[in-house]
Regions:
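Gly/Thr-rich phosphate-binding beta-strand-loop-beta motif of the actin/hexokinase/Hsp70
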Residues: 46-73
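ATPase catalytic-site recognition across NTP-hydrolyzing enzymes
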Residues: 1-55
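Mg2+-dependent endonuclease catalytic cores in nucleic-acid-processing enzymes, primarily RNase H-like
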Residues: 69-189
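Active-site-proximal structural scaffolding
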Residues: 3, 61-64, 88, 168
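Polar low-complexity intrinsically disordered regions enriched in Ser/Thr and small residues
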Residues: 27, 41-42, 61, 91, ...
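Short, flexible loop/turn elements at secondary-structure junctions
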Residues: 14, 56-61, 85, 113
Length: 190
């Protein structure tokens, strides 16, 4: 409506400017709540629990970026114990020098649907590289859900999550500052 458009275009007080700046942040309030509830603390590796990994992969014609999150499940609690990210490394390097060097006992490696893309360095798919390295993994196909539905699933699970305050800090800062995009012509969130 006109009032919201005016506030967005011409914030008149600092509170309106702050609301506009933080309005598009998906997870900022959830991260703040996790700090208040002491769910962002040191979360050590528990050798009695298996570790799961999940990845995020970005690819551009000039580089490959990847991140790995390490978590354990204890009853209904998801414990994020570690996070690593890197650029310009082959998948084989990541498998042998990052995954294998951790003291963790792994239950499963969850890979995103885009494992079928070719690595810039080797021109093999990440799937081929992982199979050549004898890695067992679960390939997650993206369900054909709306972005908002996927966001709500994570929002529902978020209260059951604890994060290691040291090992996961870079990831927490990234997701805290992640902003949703808006179509400039319709002002609808995408």
């Amino acid at each position: 409506d006109l009032k919201d458009n005016m506030k967005r275009e011409y914030p008149s007080v600092y509170q309106e400017a702050f609301e506009i700046a933080t309005e598009w942040a998906y997870r900022q309030s959830q991260i703040n709540m996790a700090y208040q509830q002491n769910r962002i603390v040191r979360v050590p590796y528990d050798p009695n629990l298996m570790v799961y990994t999940c990845r995020d992969i970005w690819w551009a014609w000039w580089w490959d970026d990847t991140s790995i999150r390490f978590f354990q499940i204890f009853w209904n609690e998801i414990r994020w114990i570690d996070y690593r990210e890197w650029s310009w490394y082959w998948m084989l390097y990541v498998l042998t020098n990052i995954i294998d060097q951790k003291p963790y006992k792994y239950a499963a490696h969850i890979w995103p649907h885009d494992m079928r893309v070719h690595e810039q360095m080797s021109w093999k798919t990440r799937l081929e590289v992982a199979k050549e390295a004898w890695y067992e993994f679960t390939l997650v196909e993206s369900p054909n859900w709306a972005v908002s539905a996927r966001i709500n699933i994570v929002r529902d699970l978020f209260s059951n999550m604890r994060f290691d305050s040291k090992n996961c800090l870079a990831w927490l800062n990234k997701i805290k500052n992640y902003k949703r995009k808006r179509n400039e012509s319709t002002w609808q969130f995408m």
